[in-house]
């Protein structure tokens, strides 16, 4: 019997406080290869792009909480075996990975990202930097309440450590999450597969944040924002070669049972610029 796979389109922009995330999800939906029987479910997200306010130290906390809650409900209704998620920012992985952790007792998580996303409101204000911590039962005190079964640190391997921020590495150590330091700007698929086998993991959920890649090698990342000034202190620039990331994911997908795959933080700056032209051109209404 064929496994049931759904595609979630989650254009959440509030958790990263940047409207371009919204359009990234929409574009990924359009360009993804079609597969008969893979139902697409779009989570409604406001597209007014109004300025956001902080609540309890978190940007738009109520809005992002509701969007995760809506995603949980949509997944529960479908009860899939596998989930593809198009974001949006990194928070979009919370609901599908939490569901898969309930479904599979032997789930492992590979987190491919320039940042480990294990922050909390005392470290950073945007929810997308807390998602892995939320899944581990830490992070934003409000959001882990939507995770019915938290991940154990032993289930998670963070791929793409590239120096990063000291406080993030300290949190990884505090939470007990294993991580693989990048060598020569390439990901180590063999190392990841060895970790999977050594830990008795049978199913994999893989999270890809596009910012793990060198912005000169892959354009649609945070660091190619045309309006970006000095790089923020808490932003680690990706250095991974795109070909290495593609090879890593292909190998994992062929040699493991990949039950969850998220593409997050695909940031189509040129599409946003084109949209601005259309908004300013009278014929569009």
Predicted regions and their residues:
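Short, glycine/polar-rich helix-capping loops at beta-to-alpha or helix-loop-helix junctions
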Residues: 164-170
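A general structural motif
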Residues: 139, 157-164, 240-244
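Short, structured patches in soluble enzyme cores that scaffold and shape functional sites
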Residues: 111-114, 136, 158-163, 181-183, ...
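Catalytic cores of soluble, metal-dependent hydrolases
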Residues: 2-84, 92-104, 173-285
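Active-site histidine-anchored catalytic micro-motif
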Residues: 82-151, 155
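A general structural signal for short secondary-structure boundary/capping elements
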Residues: 153-159, 204-206
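Surface-exposed, flexible loop/turn segments at secondary-structure boundaries
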Residues: 117, 164, 269
């Amino acid at each position: 019997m064929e496994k049931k796979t759904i595609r979630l389109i989650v254009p959440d922009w509030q958790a990263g406080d940047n409207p371009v995330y919204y359009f990234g999800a929409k574009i990924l939906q359009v360009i993804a290869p079609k597969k008969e029987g893979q139902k697409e479910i779009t989570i409604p997200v406001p597209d007014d792009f109004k300025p956001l306010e902080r609540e309890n130290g978190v940007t738009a906390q109520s809005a992002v909480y509701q969007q995760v809650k809506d995603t949980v409900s949509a997944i529960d209704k479908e009860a899939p075996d596998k989930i593809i998620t198009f974001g949006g920012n990194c928070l979009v992985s919370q609901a599908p990975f939490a569901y898969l952790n309930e479904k599979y007792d032997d789930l492992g998580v590979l987190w491919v990202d320039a940042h480990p996303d294990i922050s909390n409101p005392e470290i950073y204000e945007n929810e997308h930097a807390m998602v892995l911590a939320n899944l581990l039962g830490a992070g934003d005190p409000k959001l882990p309440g939507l995770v019915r079964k938290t991940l154990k640190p032993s289930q998670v391997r963070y791929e793409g450590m590239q120096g990063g921020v000291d406080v993030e590495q300290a949190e990884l150590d505090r939470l007990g999450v294993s991580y693989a330091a990048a060598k020569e700007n390439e990901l180590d698929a063999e190392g990841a597969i060895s970790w999977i086998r050594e830990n008795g993991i049978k199913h994999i959920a893989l999270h890809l944040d596009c910012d793990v890649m060198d912005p000169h090698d892959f354009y649609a990342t945070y660091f190619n924002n045309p309006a970006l000034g000095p790089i923020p202190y808490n932003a680690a620039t990706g250095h991974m070669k795109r070909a290495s990331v593609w090879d890593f994911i292909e190998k994992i997908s062929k040699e493991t049972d990949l039950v969850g795959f998220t593409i997050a933080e695909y940031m189509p700056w040129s599409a946003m610029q084109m949209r601005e032209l259309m908004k300013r051109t009278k014929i569009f209404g």
